[in-house]
């Protein structure tokens, strides 16, 4: 009875993992999510501010080696750097603390500061929100820091897969922002 049921459940779980790992099903599921907010083309003529969501940084490795360590979502940082140059008058904000319970003293912001310095940008031009642990806190803690005014155009940079969630929480806190998705992972079908 029970042993047979457990074996059947284990077999089914293993089969599901294999299907997700070795077939294009994962990309097929990810693709519609990544397409919810299209890439900005053309870019707006004017932007008042740019918010970079955390998630591309590896604070533990940055701290250990003293140089910026990035993960596969590094495109968000390079996009932030490029947009900061394109819109030099825009206010710049990075939002991301740590979700790592073992390394609460390490912030993603330090990685961003080092990266921007290496890119020739002054990290002091950026406001840093370093307490958030999730997307909701990114929006809730960044809005009072950035103090956006009515009618201003703000871009929010994040991975294409997470930008729908980010847009939802930014709207929930009463901040109307424009999505700037990057770090696509699903192939174009």
Which positions does each model-derived feature cover?
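Membrane-interface helix-boundary motifs at transmembrane edges
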Residues: 2-7
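A structural signal for short, hydrophobic/glycine-enriched beta-strand patches
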Residues: 14, 19-189
